[in-house]
A protein has these predicted regions:
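N-terminal secretory signal peptides that target proteins for export/translocation
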Residues: 1-15
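Sec-dependent N-terminal signal peptides
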Residues: 14-27
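C-terminal motif of bacterial Sec signal peptides marking the signal peptidase cleavage site
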Residues: 33-35
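Residues within mature, well-folded domains
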Residues: 37-183
Length: 183
């Protein structure tokens, strides 16, 4: 990305401001639309076989086995996106559900003191970031999402040494707001 900006700045000298603005707009659109392909795809219908799901959605980032013989396919939007889709395939090899899981409603289903890292992975997929809180020796998984469909937020899931969720804290996503960036 830095290389492209350096090149654009050098081009400005030769092209002038209007041409540079057009170049910046075209670069911005191509980068932003490239990340939207997952959002623009129509999900396969419920009951579709696994092969059709993968043909339509592509190779999942991860596959999680379920105790009943089914599986959950993770179609990632993290680390930069605010959406993460999970396709649940039943033991019969057919699509049961396909949903965007990074929502306040879905986060509310996590059981403090009972949910495990495996539960969180199967429910939400891989986090955008991981960190540690030394005071409690917690591992923290952070997920970007749109709180109430509006606010750029992060949900921080705190695990104890046994991998059990001890607390969840949401707040503004510093990636989208300079006031909350660490300096």
């Amino acid at each position: 990305m830095t290389h492209l900006l350096d090149k654009a700045l050098r081009v400005r000298v030769r092209l002038g401001a209007p041409a540079l603005a057009a170049l910046a707009l075209s670069l911005s659109l191509s980068l932003s639309l490239g990340g939207c392909t997952q959002l623009l795809r129509q999900p396969p219908p419920a009951g579709a076989p696994l092969a059709e799901v993968q043909a339509k959605l592509g190779t999942p980032r991860a596959v999680y086995r379920l105790p009943d013989g089914g599986q959950v396919l993770e179609y990632a939007g993290q680390p930069m996106g605010q959406f993460q889709h999970m396709a649940t395939i039943g033991a019969d090899g057919r699509l049961v559900s396909y949903e965007q899981v990074l929502t306040s409603e879905k986060f509310a289903t996590v059981k403090i003191g009972r949910s495990t890292k495996d539960d969180i992975l199967r429910t939400f997929g891989h986090p955008a970031e991981t960190s540690r809180v030394a005071f409690h020796n917690y591992e923290v998984w952070s997920y970007r999402y749109k709180e109430a469909g509006v606010w750029n937020s992060m949900m921080h899931v705190h695990f104890d040494e046994g991998g059990i969720v001890q607390q969840m804290i949401n707040g503004p996503d510093p990636m989208y707001d300079d006031r909350f960036r660490f300096r």
